[in-house]
């Protein structure tokens, strides 16, 4: 379940424990619907409510991990249904860290990755309610490939007006670029 009222002292999600029948590491919320989508890609979000909102607004290709971080099993499951994944995690620091952890798993599964960073809202659900599906579609079209996204994350760590920080940024960016192809 998910808390509806905003309570900073309560967990946002309360999830069932894993059992022999229900294995969160191997299932994705909404996949039963998303695998039928004609859009040609899947959208991976953090929360059930994000996936539900996306479906309500016409993005019938949205899935969410079931109250757990993305796993290798999830990535493999995604690769059975698509070659392209839009990774759209919450805008907060935890969501962006989770996106960074998800990228290599999705790559190992052979998926092409686009990363969309939500602006002016905390998550896809809130964004859709505030701005609607047309603005969300524009965000999808403007989403970054994983290298652009990671370079932007690195850039955000440094004030490149300072020489020492500019040097640190260039070194870290070069390290990322050296891992490519």
Where are the predicted features?
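C-terminal or mid-to-C-terminal helical accessory/interaction module adjacent to the motor/catalytic core
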Residues: 112-181
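Conserved catalytic cores of soluble enzyme domains
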Residues: 68-120, 127-133
